[in-house]
């Protein structure tokens, strides 16, 4: 069980570290999956990373329609917070920054929650990863208009997305646990 006194702050720090490591690991998993499945190297993309309209790279398609949810979020932040319109060359790194920031912060919240409700760490974080997938990719991203609805994607996209988030959840928990033992 637990070999330390609960501390929300220490849990949050451990979770932030776990979330960052998990975001990187998820990114690497997605890059490998994509290379195997399609022979490309595009990474950091589950359903939230799919264009909201049309298909990838369709001729004549507006580039704004091809932007994934992380790029769309980065564009809104850049414009509304910094007064800067993202250039085409800035979109990929800005989208990756959103991916890592969201994954890191989510990990921090998970780490804090693990301190007060240790049951969330059950099954090495896999239920956490599945829940994160469901709430983020399947519900929130479409509701915010950042991607099409879940029924617009083939089952293979959902499998890819769920597998990616299971990798995230497992890595977040194992990393959080290791860091928390040190704190």
Where are these regions (language model features)?
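Short amphipathic, positively biased membrane-proximal segments
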Residues: 1-183
């Amino acid at each position: 069980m637990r070999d330390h006194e609960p501390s929300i702050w220490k849990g949050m720090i451990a979770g932030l570290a776990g979330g960052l490591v998990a975001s990187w690991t998820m990114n690497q998993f997605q890059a490998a999956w994509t290379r195997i499945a399609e022979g490309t190297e595009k990474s950091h993309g589950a359903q939230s990373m799919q264009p909201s309209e049309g298909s990838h790279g369709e001729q004549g398609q507006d580039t704004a329609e091809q932007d994934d949810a992380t790029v769309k979020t980065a564009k809104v932040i850049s414009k509304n917070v910094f007064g800067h319109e993202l250039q085409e060359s800035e979109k990929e790194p800005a989208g990756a920054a959103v991916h890592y920031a969201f994954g890191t912060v989510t990990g921090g919240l998970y780490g804090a929650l693990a301190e007060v409700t240790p049951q969330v760490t059950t099954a090495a974080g896999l239920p956490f990863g599945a829940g994160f997938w469901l709430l983020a990719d399947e519900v929130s991203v479409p509701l915010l208009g950042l991607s099409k609805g879940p029924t617009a994607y083939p089952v293979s996209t959902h499998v890819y997305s769920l597998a990616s988030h299971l990798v995230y959840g497992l890595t977040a928990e194992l990393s959080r646990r290791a860091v928390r033992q040190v704190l």
